[in-house]
């Protein structure tokens, strides 16, 4: 059940049977980018990983994608027991906020806080803050910050991918239309407020690019991932300028 207010839409209870419908009802936009309210982390239940650009009716990449793993378990709200759940769309920002406490089949409990925003002053930018706190787990936590294929992956052809030390980008073309999009991403990770400086493992596949980072935690430790993604397209820029423009926007955040 959703609660509608002047500037917010709130969800107080977790109902997996209604998740797909609620994701669509909480769709948000900054008049250039538009996203459904799908979970950032992996979810094995029904969902639509949709991000749209103004003027293109085909979903592009899953810009907000991440993955969270413990030593031998993967965070998945469809499988884990949801102890507490709250989600709120702040329509005037636009910002999607989610607070979740979950317990794995092996009894490990995590507290998740996710804040995903489509910027109004830089409309080509999506910003994500994703916080993972261990409540009773001691061991490694691996977080992947990635760009992955979305709902309409078969309609996009990858032209070029790049994964550096702290940023990555992908350049794609829509088939059969002659439309091109470049998406660039950077990230940072902190543990209990201190920057994590170890070099990540690069992830570079045809349908997924990004970074994998592992930290050992004890109960009450908190990892915070900050992720920025820039999207530019050939409706607004010359195709040969897309990569440079995406990197320029990312640098100027």
What is the predicted function of each stretch?
Residues 1-24, 32, 37-38, 43, ...:
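Acidic/polar, glycine-enriched structural segments that form the non-catalytic walls/loops
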């Amino acid at each position: 059940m959703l609660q509608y207010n002047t500037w917010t839409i709130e969800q107080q209870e977790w109902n997996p049977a209604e998740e797909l419908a609620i994701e669509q009802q909480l769709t948000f936009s900054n008049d250039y980018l538009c996203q459904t309210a799908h979970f950032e982390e992996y979810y094995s239940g029904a969902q639509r990983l949709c991000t749209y650009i103004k003027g293109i009716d085909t979903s592009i990449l899953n810009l907000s994608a991440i993955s969270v793993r413990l030593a031998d378990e993967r965070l998945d709200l469809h499988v884990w027991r949801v102890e507490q759940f709250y989600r709120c769309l702040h329509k005037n920002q636009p910002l999607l906020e989610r607070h979740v406490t979950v317990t794995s089949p092996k009894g490990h409990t995590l507290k998740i806080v996710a804040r995903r925003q489509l910027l109004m002053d830089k409309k080509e930018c999506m910003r994500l803050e994703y916080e993972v706190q261990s409540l009773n787990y001691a061991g490694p936590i691996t977080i992947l910050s990635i760009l992955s294929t979305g709902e309409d992956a078969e309609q996009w052809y990858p032209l070029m991918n790049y994964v550096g030390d702290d940023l990555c980008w992908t350049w794609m073309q829509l088939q059969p239309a002659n439309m091109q999009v470049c998406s660039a991403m950077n990230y940072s990770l902190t543990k209990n407020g201190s920057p994590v400086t170890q070099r990540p493992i690069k992830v570079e596949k045809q349908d997924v690019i990004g970074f994998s980072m592992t930290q050992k935690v004890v109960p009450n430790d908190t990892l915070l991932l900050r992720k920025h993604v820039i999207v530019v397209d050939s409706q607004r820029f010359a195709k040969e300028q897309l990569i440079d423009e995406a990197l320029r926007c990312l640098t100027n955040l």
